[in-house]
Amino acid sequence: MKSTFFPHFTIGVDAYDAIPDICLDYGKTAVIVGGEKSRAAAEPLIRKAIEGKIELLGSFQYGDDATFENAEALTRIPEIRKADMVFAVGGGRATDTAKWATHLLKKPLFTFPTLASNCASVTAVCIMYHPDHSFKGSIYRDRNAYHTFINTEVIAHSPREYFWAGLGDALAKQYEVPFSARGMDLTWVQETGVRNAQNVAPGILKYGKAALEAVDKGIVTDALEPAILSIIVAPGMASVCIEDDLDSSLAHAIYNSHTRTPHKGNHLHGAVVNYGLQVMLTMDGQIEERDKIYRFAKSI
């Protein structure tokens, strides 16, 4: 038997107002797990939204990277063990650490992305690293988060470089999944995942530049929401339908090897992935698509 859980999400400047109605079905106590900056950005808004309805037992730093060691350390914190549910707040590495910790504890997980940098908040896969920050591997939970709350105001005030890198990372899904699935006899669910992957790039290419300008100004505009959905939800809709060997390809392989290879500069995940995507498209002879991605990358 196999179950597929599509992402459930709420998006908007008032997205956190929906927390009590959705989360009270799973208990009355919660903890927040995330990074220092992400908790500073989102925690006051979360506390206000749940005041008098859900008791917050504590707020905890996830660690310094998505490692099994950090996830296991979280499982030993008494307040986390006691809480009915966990609120994972932040970017991909904080979220993936909380995802694995809640998998070990068998607790309901709700995610609150404060960056539009990847699809981690809506997927079941956890991308894990060694304590030295080199890539270790990926591992799957039995399901993704129960619900994801995407506050567009919070993301509008997030660091520009993460949103910029998120645009680059999301574009890879459009091409990596069909590339990996080429020639395979796919199940209905896998075929759905491949089709979902091919819905990512249009939103990025149409709204990405204007959305990045909104983040530069710290404002919510009509372009911001569809761009956020194209970074967080659209790739996630593909990921939940396909296995690990279809979920990525050469673009992400180049990033993963980058973490283990001496290199100059400090390049964000999405930036390296987008470079890897252009290498993959060149290798595959998709020159027109490569040039389209290159022009977009240069424009931002």
Language model regions located:
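Short glycine/serine/threonine-rich phosphate/pyrophosphate-binding segments
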Residues: 16, 39-43, 93-99, 119-122, ...
